Curated annotation (Swiss-Prot):
<comment type="similarity">
    <text>Belongs to the HrcA family.</text>
</comment>
<dbReference type="InterPro" id="IPR002571">
    <property type="entry name" value="HrcA"/>
</dbReference>
<keyword id="KW-0346">Stress response</keyword>
<dbReference type="GO" id="GO:0045892">
    <property type="term" value="P:negative regulation of DNA-templated transcription"/>
</dbReference>
<keyword id="KW-0678">Repressor</keyword>
<protein>
    <recommendedName>
        <fullName>Heat-inducible transcription repressor HrcA</fullName>
    </recommendedName>
</protein>
<keyword id="KW-0805">Transcription regulation</keyword>
<dbReference type="Pfam" id="PF01628">
    <property type="entry name" value="HrcA"/>
</dbReference>
<keyword id="KW-0804">Transcription</keyword>
<dbReference type="InterPro" id="IPR021153">
    <property type="entry name" value="HrcA_C"/>
</dbReference>
<dbReference type="InterPro" id="IPR036390">
    <property type="entry name" value="WH_DNA-bd_sf"/>
</dbReference>
<dbReference type="GO" id="GO:0003677">
    <property type="term" value="F:DNA binding"/>
</dbReference>
<comment type="function">
    <text>Negative regulator of class I heat shock genes (grpE-dnaK-dnaJ and groELS operons). Prevents heat-shock induction of these operons.</text>
</comment>
<dbReference type="InterPro" id="IPR029016">
    <property type="entry name" value="GAF-like_dom_sf"/>
</dbReference>
<dbReference type="InterPro" id="IPR036388">
    <property type="entry name" value="WH-like_DNA-bd_sf"/>
</dbReference>
Length: 362
């Protein structure tokens, strides 16, 4: 603790939870000013904003104590103060009053997503949810959905070259996925047709994971039913469904351009460039979002709490959504600067996740 405390604003041996009301008010004003402007705020401005009459000198003393506690810091370019990541976390956890969506906002989100959900695929509805969320929060919106939970309807093989074919997977909800398959040498078109017929008779209504297990078992039992080349096509098709790390997950991002708004300096531009680079590292984003699938409700990662975006100084607010059986099947949320309007964004993410769950019957 700082040695000066002439008016007793901070109790002796104070931890973060023991800040008294005056200290909390000064700290709250520093954070709220940062969230609104992105700029450091000085003691003179703080003394005008707080409800208790304190001189700028007295405010500076309290700010020095807050700085020693690790809640605020002085950027080298300014005499004012900004909140640290620890300070932002303390603000979000202990001081922030989470707002609520207005009834028109709720109705607008629900009506727009429900209309898309009735007329289009789940993927289209999720994309619309992200577009809406990105527009409301002025941040980038992301969704991670489990492709493994999609139930299959139809498969088709289309030859591209003598040893390459396109595998077209059609899901019951209308999603279509294409994958390029390497064919064994000498496979005739008849083998592609036979393989498609064999698979279509057995995969309908199954998830990718269920279909893989079923077909791997059947291929061992029923080798005599299929010629050798058709067996190879089916085996190659099954292998293509397995994919690599994260291939059973689909990542959708909307609203990159929002991150370019309100840049204050070259440092901000570099931060956004790093964030764009991070968003392109899909494996890392998938890992991050996957951490929220076991959570109940909204999760918030601020700055270096999230290793993926630590260099870009970004925050992530995410929430899981469920299917008709109540199983968590994906995560959605927003990624933006650490000065996100947390009180407004948190209920937006939470409500959007609830509406998506309702659309899926969850």
């Amino acid at each position: 603790m700082a040695q000066h405390d002439p008016i007793g604003l901070i109790a002796p041996n104070a931890g973060l939870a023991q800040l008294n009301e005056r200290s909390r008010e000064i700290f709250r004003q520093i954070v709220e000013s940062y969230l609104a402007t992105g700029e450091p705020v000085g003691s003179r401005n703080i003394s005008r904003l707080i409800s208790v009459p304190l001189s700028p000198a007295s405010v500076r003393n309290v700010m020095a104590d807050l700085e020693q506690l690790g809640l605020i810091y002085a950027p080298h370019t300014s005499a004012g103060r900004l909140p640290t990541e620890l300070g932002l976390r303390f603000f979000v956890d202990a001081l922030m009053q989470i707002g609520d969506l207005t009834e028109p906002e709720r109705q607008s989100i629900q009506a727009q997503l429900s209309s898309v959900g009735r007329a289009h695929t789940v993927e289209a509805a999720l994309g619309e949810a992200l577009t809406r969320l990105s527009g409301l929060t002025r941040a980038a919106a992301v969704v991670l959905t489990a492709k493994a939970n999609v139930r299959l309807k139809h498969i088709e093989f289309v030859r591209l070259e003598p040893e390459r074919a396109l595998v077209i997977l059609v899901a019951e909800d209308g999603q279509v996925e294409n994958r390029v398959l390497t064919l064994p040498p000498g496979v005739p078109s008849s083998a592609l047709i036979e393989a498609a017929n064999y698979l279509n008779a057995r995969i309908r209504g199954r998830t990718l994971a269920e279909a893989r297990l079923e077909l791997e078992s059947l291929m061992v039992q029923n080798k005599a039913e299929l010629d050798q080349l058709t067996q190879k096509v089916i085996a190659a098709g099954i292998a293509s469904w397995s994919g690599g790390d994260g291939e059973d997950r689909q990542l959708i991002v909307r609203g990159h351009a929002n991150l370019l708004e309100d840049l204050h300096a070259l440092d901000d531009l570099e931060r956004v460039r790093l964030l764009f680079d991070d968003l392109e590292t899909k494996r890392g984003v998938i890992d991050l979002l996957g951490r929220a699938e076991s959570a109940d409700g909204v999760r918030i990662f601020i700055g270096s709490e999230n290793k993926l975006f630590s260099l870009s100084g970004s925050s992530t607010i995410i929430a899981p959504y469920s299917d008709g059986a109540g199983h968590i099947v994906g995560v959605l949320g927003v990624i933006g600067p650490t000065r996100l309007n947390y009180a407004r964004v948190i209920p937006m993410v939470d409500y959007t996740a609830r509406i998506v769950s309702r659309m899926l019957g969850g």
